[in-house]
Structures are given as structure tokens and as C-alpha cells.
């Protein structure tokens, strides 16, 4: 948390909310890939992603892409967002990579491949 107040705020592909934007549930939230041909997620089976237990609510910034989204009470929120910046890219993963929110996600068969592609996208 706190990215909206950090030095990186203007570089992010999302706009962080000014209030406590942590959303949690023991039932979990459904995940859906919006851009399956995006280099970061190409070839991953998003239909098998188990529900995530929480995320940081935000909005996609102008010029950013929502690659993967998460649903809460009928509303969709960015889960994986990305934007080009200079010669590179900035990516935000709006949930945890640790067992707290991601315990189910860590059991996803494509978990390792996801992280590998996140840092080394297929071109």
C-alpha cells in the first residue's frame, strides 16, 4: 500500500484511491483475463485461476491497459495493469504475491510461468 503517495505515483498504470482501498474476503474474488494475447499473459490458462482473497482497489490510468481484472459485487477492477513509459514498461499487480491473499493463486498450475512472463514478456 501507499503507492499513491509514493514517488512512483505518476509512473504507475493505475490511479490509487485516496482512502483505504484494501478489499478482502474469505470467499475470494473471481479473476478474468481481458487481454489474453498480451505478451505478459499469453498462453496462460486464466480459466483455471482460483479465487483470490483480496486486492487493492484502483482505477486504470489514461494510457494504461487493464490486462487482468478481478470482480467484486458485480464491479470489475484492474488486477494486472501495464503502461509503456519511456523505453520500458510499468506493471502493477494489485494483490499480494505472498500466501496472505495469494494462497490459492500460488497453487495455480501456471503460477511460476506467470511470474516468469511478468518479468520477461513473450514478444
What are these regions (language model features)?
Residues 1-74:
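An acidic, glycine-rich "communication" segment
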Residues 3, 80-81:
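Mature catalytic domains of secreted/periplasmic carbohydrate-active enzymes
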Residues 64, 90-91:
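A broad, low-specificity signal marking well-ordered, structured residues that form hydrophobic/aromatic
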Residues 68, 81-84:
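Short acidic-hydrophobic surface loop/beta-edge motif
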Residues 68-69, 92-94:
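Short beta-strand segments
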Residues 74-77, 84-89, 95-123:
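Extracellular ligand-binding/catalytic regions of CAZymes and related secreted enzymes
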Amino acid at each position: 500500500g501507499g503507492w499513491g503517495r509514493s514517488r512512483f505515483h505518476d509512473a504507475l498504470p493505475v490511479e490509487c484511491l485516496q482512502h483505504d482501498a484494501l478489499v478482502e474476503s474469505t470467499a475470494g474474488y473471481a479473476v478474468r483475463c481481458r487481454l489474453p494475447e498480451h505478451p505478459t499473459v499469453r498462453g496462460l490458462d486464466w480459466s483455471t485461476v482460483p479465487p483470490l482473497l483480496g486486492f487493492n482497489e484502483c482505477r486504470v490510468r489514461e494510457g494504461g491497459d487493464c490486462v487482468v481484472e478481478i470482480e467484486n459485487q458485480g464491479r470489475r477492477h484492474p488486477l494486472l495493469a501495464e503502461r509503456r513509459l519511456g523505453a520500458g514498461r510499468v506493471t502493477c499487480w494489485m494483490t499480494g504475491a505472498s500466501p496472505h491473499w495469494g494462497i490459492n493463486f500460488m497453487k495455480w498450475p501456471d503460477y511460476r510461468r506467470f511470474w516468469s512472463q511478468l518479468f520477461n514478456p513473450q514478444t
